[in-house]
Amino acid sequence: MKELTKVEEEVMQVIWNRKKGLVRDFIEDLPDPKPPYSTISSVVRILEKKGFVNHKAYGKTHEYFPVIAKDDYRKFVLNSLAERFFSGSPRALMSFFAREEKLGLKDMSEIISEIKKAEDND
């Protein structure tokens, strides 16, 4: 899996939210000013080449849908971030966020509860 550019990620967020759609649908969900159709069409084709989306053809019309789940990409990006900036240590990454984002005890307690739930489900 490859990391996406900012524009690719923005378009991918729209595709994940919509579940499927045409290029014009994706443009509709993007913030103003709306980018040109040709730009978003190119980005979607790049996303397809990168393996993030696929399409069904209905004549000349293509309906695109995500192939990679949002959670899978999120996990990939966070692991990549931990590798690049925190020597691969999730603990160092979490410590950084706890310090920099000024997480309180309540927030930390909720995070610990989430981790315990995830471990119980494994």
At which residue positions do the language-model features occur?
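Short alpha-helical segments that sit at the start of domains
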Residues: M1-Q13, A69, N121
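Short, cationic-aromatic polyanion-contact patches
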Residues: L4-V7, Y58-V77
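Pre-recognition alpha-helix immediately N-terminal to the DNA-recognition helix
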Residues: E9-V14, D25, A92
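Short acidic, hydrophobic short linear motifs in intrinsically disordered regions
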Residues: K20-D29
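Short, hydrophobic-biased segments on the C-terminal half of alpha helices
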Residues: S41-R45
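Glycine-centered, phosphate/nucleic-acid-interacting loop/turn motifs that mediate DNA/RNA or nucleotide
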Residues: G51
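Short beta-strand "wing" residues that participate in macromolecule-binding interfaces
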Residues: H55
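Amphipathic alpha-helical dimerization/coiled-coil segments
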Residues: V77-D120
